């Protein structure tokens, strides 16, 4: 496939040059953001999460945003150690309010995953390390998601310095609980849909990554996730296998038998009716996979093994993105420590999830899962008690990769990177994507900044300087092309 497509380029070089000129200041801004350990899962660090929100408010004020609000979400629900623990606020702000312009809402999160140097970091996780030889910025939150969040601020600063008018109205929505379940966000979006977000025409999220390390992508789909547990309970207490082994029905044996009927060794889901709900692959979609820059070797490198179930790129990507999968996650209540323990567990809970795709209906999937597991347990004729439950579910999301948003983002990407981006889907879930689409009734674009090897949630999280600075150019260029669409 050609590395370029023909389109009318906008005169954006002055903007790109200004972003390059401001590079030292932009790196300093990210350094300040990383220095605030805004770990949402650590109650003792909640003041730091709030400090990060206030940092963003100060930045927005300096840049000329208006109608800046800190939306308080109330007390955090259990389980918590502090019953009065307050949820971090959601930061809202506007830049421009011209009724003749389109309005773009950008979402990001300012909280991060926990990180300690003792975890294996080469440097202090909350002190940004700038490796000038490799041109890499290391630090917790560098790519997930403080880099993209301050990237939007950088775009505004570059326009201000140039004296350029922003081609759209911009609304920002930055939350502080994304890494801990986005508590309160869905309710706020629903509440503000006809208030603060009333005139929004489009939502852009930069909270995902390139598929690999060399080619930018635009993401138009995410799988959903239905998470289940199977509870099997027998004896009144854990028992000694030397005394009771062979003479009672063991819950663990029942559970293993039932869980073995869910998926086979090739990854095929064995629950009847699941694949009947999957939307057929169209020729147009199938062609999108041809040009995507990916290989079996990259999968092996990412997994640290040679255990792929598929031997070619297209099959790997289809099974990661557009076919459902079932994964067994663990067994609660069973012995899992080192050494040998001859206990018969009295109660075990098996955990598994199904990644969902179009056109799987969540409720119908639940019914199929419950029917299958109930049927398989009945075949055992076991005297043990049995129950299957849905723990949580989140729907899949798929957009039109040929709409105005994606077309504008593709042009901006080509301007900056001189290559047509890959159009990708992802195997994971970003639930807020669906919430914005449903509540606001507008298109959502996933426009990633970081690479596939950035190590979000891992040790030595990083963001390449080229991705950070070119990412800012891409975000800015996108606003111009979308404003003209």
Swiss-Prot record:
One of its GO terms (cellular component) is cytoplasm. Zn(2+) 1 binds at residues 144, 179, 457. GO terms for biological process: proteolysis. The keyword Protease applies. The active site is at residues 111, 178. Its EC number is 3.4.13.-. It is found in: Cytoplasm. Its cofactor is Zn(2+); Mn(2+). GO terms for molecular function: metal ion binding; metallodipeptidase activity; peptidase activity. Zn(2+) 2 binds at residues 109, 144, 207. Keywords: Cytoplasm, Dipeptidase, Hydrolase, Manganese, Metal-binding, Metalloprotease, Phosphoprotein, Protease, Zinc. Disulfide bonds: none annotated. PROSITE patterns: ARGE_DAPE_CPG2_2. Catalytic component of the GSH degradosomal complex involved in the degradation of glutathione (GSH) and other peptides containing a gamma-glu-X bond. Also functions as a dipeptidase with high specificity for Cys-Gly and no activity toward tri- or tetrapeptides. Belongs to the peptidase M20A family. PANTHER family: BETA-ALA-HIS DIPEPTIDASE (PTHR43270), CARNOSINE DIPEPTIDASE 2, ISOFORM A (PTHR43270:SF4). Homodimer. Component of the GSH degradosomal complex. This is Cys-Gly metallodipeptidase DUG1. It comes from Candida albicans (strain SC5314 / ATCC MYA-2876) (Yeast). The lineage of its organism: Eukaryota, Fungi, Dikarya, Ascomycota, Saccharomycotina.
């Amino acid at each position: 496939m050609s590395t370029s497509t023909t389109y009318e380029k906008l005169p954006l070089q002055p903007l790109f040059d200004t972003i390059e000129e401001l590079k030292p200041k932009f790196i300093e801004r990210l350094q300040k953001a990383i220095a605030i350990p805004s770990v949402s899962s650590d109650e003792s660090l909640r003041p730091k999460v709030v400090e990060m929100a206030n940092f963003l408010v100060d930045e927005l004020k300096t840049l000329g945003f208006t109608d800046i609000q800190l939306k308080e979400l109330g007390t955090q629900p259990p389980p918590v150690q502090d019953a009065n623990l307050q949820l971090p606020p959601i930061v809202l702000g506007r830049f421009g309010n011209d009724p003749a312009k389109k309005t773009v809402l950008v979402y990001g999160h300012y909280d991060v995953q926990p990180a300690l140097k003792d975890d294996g970091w080469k440097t202090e996780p909350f002190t940004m390390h700038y490796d000038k030889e490799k041109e890499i910025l290391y630090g917790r939150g560098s790519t997930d998601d403080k880099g993209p969040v301050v990237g939007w601020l950088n775009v505004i600063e570059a326009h201000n310095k140039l004296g350029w008018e922003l081609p759209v109205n911009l609304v920002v929505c930055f939350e502080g609980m994304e890494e801990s379940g986005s508590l309160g966000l869905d309710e706020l979006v629903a509440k503000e849909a006809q208030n603060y977000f009333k005139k929004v025409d489009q939502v852009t999220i930069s909270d995902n990554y390139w598929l690999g390390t060399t080619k930018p992508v635009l993401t138009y789909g995410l799988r959903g996730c239905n998470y289940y547990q199977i509870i099997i309970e027998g004896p009144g207490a854990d028992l000694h296998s030397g005394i009771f082994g062979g003479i009672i029905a063991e819950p663990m044996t029942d559970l293993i038998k039932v869980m073995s009927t869910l998926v086979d060794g090739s990854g095929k889901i064995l629950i009847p009716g699941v694949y009947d709900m999957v939307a057929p692959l169209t020729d147009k979609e199938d062609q999108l996979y041809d040009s995507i820059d990916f290989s079996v070797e990259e999968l092996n490198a990412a997994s640290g093994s040679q255990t792929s179930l598929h031997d070619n790129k297209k099959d790997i990507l289809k099974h990661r993105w557009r076919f459902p999968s079932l994964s067994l996650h663990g067994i609660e209540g069973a012995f899992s420590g080192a050494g040998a323990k001859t206990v018969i567990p009295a109660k075990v809970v098996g955990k598994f999830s199904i990644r969902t795709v179009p056109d799987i209906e969540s409720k119908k999937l639940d019914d199929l899962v419950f029917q299958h597991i109930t049927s398989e347990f009945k075949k055992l004729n076991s005297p043990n008690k049995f129950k299957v439950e849905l723990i949580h579910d989140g729907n899949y999301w798929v957009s039109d990769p040929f709409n105005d948003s994606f077309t504008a983002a593709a042009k901006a990407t080509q301007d900056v990177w001189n290559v047509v981006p890959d159009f990708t889907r992802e195997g994971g879930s970003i639930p807020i994507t669906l919430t914005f689409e449903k509540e606001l009734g507008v298109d959502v674009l996933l426009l990633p900044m970081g690479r596939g090897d950035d190590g979000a949630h891992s040790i030595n999280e990083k963001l390449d300087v080229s991705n950070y600075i070119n990412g800012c150019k891409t975000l800015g260029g996108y606003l111009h092309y979308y404003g003209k669409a």
